[in-house]
Amino acid sequence: MTKNIGKITQIISAVVDVKFTNNGELPEILNALECYNDKQRIVLEVAQHIGDDTVRCIAMDSTEGLVRGVEVMDTGSPICIPVGTETLGRIMNVVGEPIDGKGDIKSSNISAIYKSAPDFTNQSTERNILVTGIKVVDLLAPYIKGGKIGLFGGAGVGKTVLIMELINNVAKAHGGYTVFAGVGERTREGNDLYHEMIDSGVIDLEKPENSKVALVYGQMNAPPGARARVALSGLTIAESFRDMNGGQDVLFFVDNIFRFTQAGSEVSALLGRIPSAVGYQPTLATDMGELQERITSTKHGSITSVQAIYVPADDLTDPAPATSFAHLDATTVLSRQIAEFGIYPAVDPLDSNSQVLDPMIVGEEHYSVARQVQQVLQTYKSLQDIIAILGMDELSEEDKLTVSRARKIQRFLSQPFHVAEVFTGSEGKFVNLADTIAGFKGLVEGKYDDLPEAAFYMVGTIDEAIEKAKILK
């Protein structure tokens, strides 16, 4: 078979035009092309056909130093990456090249990053709770095993810390495999996560086959093409783990889905497409749907996905986060107002929700306590204007009691994290679901009305709050 060779005719940032004149055959849309820039392999992905002999491509690596006239070869298939157990304990980039300095990834299994979602008949509809050990999440917006979970928040409210704590609490206790896709986030955070996983034993450097996690990075400094595709590369590895050996349960962490959308917007502008609302690509809903529909559970294995989603200017109606909402089973909304009070995790207990907060799934007691907690907090929120204008003295005795309980609940929703121990100096806490329900049930029923507010701040179980109250007295 003769190789289909073309030549670069134009380079504009991450967009490269390639002319094929040999036999008139143009590479298919989404095919991967290869060229070399100073002995470094660069992968280009076909995005458009221009005329009879030219294709417009998106570069997956920096185009600095690339010149017109360089030969480009059509690989005949989309971007393919190594999958399977050989990827465990390794860090790779969007095209499957190792970036951890540990040599090539010797995998006999290679898979294209574009696939169809499993058939409807093969998808699972089971709903089981995934206990995270984080009180506010487990009580008010519980996660689903095999579901899609979104962590929404503006800049600096704690999305990455929360995702790291979830990796710590869920991935370490989880028997199966974990895949982490770093999409357009800080290289330092990726490095911290890698070394933390080595320290905790999730990655075994001496025997990589004993590792439990594979990492795929396309960080902030990567070209838009890489950032737009790295989530698909990570998902391809997660799918391979899900389908191997008759089915596995896989955890798939993505930080950050907004950067995936942002990169798609950059690529779209470079390709000359007319932007839609707020400058996003006209294909925003399609791009999001193609990624999210593949993150699903089958009758044999599951993918539980936790996705951090940056909210520009704290506006949840922005098209990027708004497009994500429809695909998610549970949403955890992080609030700047709550972070300003020093309550961490800064999860908004009234904005966050979950499809499984249903008495048929979580049980009558859990559902009842969660709704009572939200009712107390909602009443307190509606009284805040009166308190601000007239003060606490003008409230009825019943309202004063509600405010007192709400403030205790707010503080009891805080929790010291394992991954933040070095910053807070407090030992991290994992709280079992039964302890969480029992603690909040006592609070809404008034069992702890005599304890000071400060006793409930940054503790795990209600017993710890009682002990703290004794010390404070």
Curated annotation (Swiss-Prot):
Q: What is the reaction catalyzed?
A: ATP + H2O + 4 H(+)(in) = ADP + phosphate + 5 H(+)(out)
- CDD domains from the entry? ATP-synt_F1_beta_C (cd18110), ATP-synt_F1_beta_N (cd18115), F1-ATPase_beta_CD (cd01133)
Q: How does it sit in the membrane?
A: Peripheral membrane protein
| GO MF term (any one) | proton-transporting ATP synthase activity, rotational mechanism
Per its UniProt entry, which superkingdom is the organism in?
Answer: Bacteria
Q: Which residues cross the membrane?
A: none
Record localization = Cell inner membrane
The EC code for this enzyme is 7.1.2.2
Q: Which UniProt keywords apply?
A: ATP synthesis, ATP-binding, Cell inner membrane, Cell membrane, CF(1), Hydrogen ion transport, Ion transport, Membrane, Nucleotide-binding, Translocase, Transport
UniProt cross-references to InterPro entries, sorted A to Z: AAA+_ATPase, ATP-synt_VA_C, ATP_synth_F1_bsu, ATPase_a/bsu_AS, ATPase_alpha/beta_chains, ATPase_F1/V1/A1_a/bsu_N, ATPase_F1/V1/A1_a/bsu_N_sf, ATPase_F1/V1/A1_a/bsu_nucl-bd
- Give the main localization category: membrane
Q: Which family does the entry's similarity section mention?
A: Belongs to the ATPase alpha/beta chains family.
Could you tell me what this protein does? Produces ATP from ADP in the presence of a proton gradient across the membrane. The catalytic sites are hosted primarily by the beta subunits.
Task: Name the HAMAP family for this protein.
Answer: ATP_synth_beta_bact
Identification of the protein by name: ATP synthase subunit beta
Q: Name the gene for this chain.
A: atpD
